[in-house]
């Protein structure tokens, strides 16, 4: 929602004394791709139910009953990437998931897509994401985790269409 509503850019501008109202997008009606449907992925799918989103999922396991009950389409990774408006990762970092979103896979994303990684660093080619964000080939990205923490790529962190947090996704009381 932060990315769809341009909240990060708006906050930066307000702090600098710039009062400009950005026109953002709504979550409702979007196609959301969930990569990894363990506990967190399933919780997210449940939370998205009221927003009338088209829900796509990719996982090594088939959660057939859960998908049916929550109106989720199980699809290939390639189909999920090419069809989704928002792609969110919920995977462990293993040999099979490391760099799962390599340059070739990232190129399947729509230009207006938003990429979210609150799972693990090392799942996404961060250099390619930065390049795509700079060229307007990806609308936005939000990461809570990075391949190297703290991240050393200050250029990525300072892009107006990037939102980063310091690995706090699981920090709650």
Describe the residue ranges of each PLM region.
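Short beta-strand "acidic-cap" motif of Rossmann-like dinucleotide-binding folds
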Residues: 55-59
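Glycine-rich Rossmann-fold phosphate-binding loop(s) that bind the pyrophosphate
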Residues: 37-38
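Short, structured coil segments at secondary-structure junctions
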Residues: 51, 70, 158-160
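Gly/Ala-rich phosphate-binding loop of Rossmann-like dinucleotide-binding domains
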Residues: 45, 49, 133-134, 157
């Amino acid at each position: 929602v932060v990315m769809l509503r341009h909240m990060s850019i708006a906050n930066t501008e307000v702090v600098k004394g710039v009062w400009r109202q950005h026109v953002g997008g709504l979550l409702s009606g979007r196609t959301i791709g969930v990569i990894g449907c363990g506990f967190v992925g399933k919780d997210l799918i449940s939370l998205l139910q009221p927003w009338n989103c088209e829900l796509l999922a990719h996982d090594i396991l088939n959660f057939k009953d859960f998908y049916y009950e929550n109106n989720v389409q199980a699809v290939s990774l390639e189909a999920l990437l090419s069809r989704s408006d928002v792609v969110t990762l919920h995977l462990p970092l293993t040999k099979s998931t490391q760099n799962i979103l390599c340059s070739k896979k990232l190129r399947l994303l729509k230009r207006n897509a938003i990429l979210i990684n609150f799972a693990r660093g090392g799942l996404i080619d961060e250099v390619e994401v930065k390049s795509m964000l700079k060229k307007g080939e990806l609308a936005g990205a939000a990461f809570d985790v990075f391949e190297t923490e703290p991240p050393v790529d200050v250029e990525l962190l300072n892009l107006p269409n990037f939102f980063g947090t310091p690995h706090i996704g699981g920090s709650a009381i």
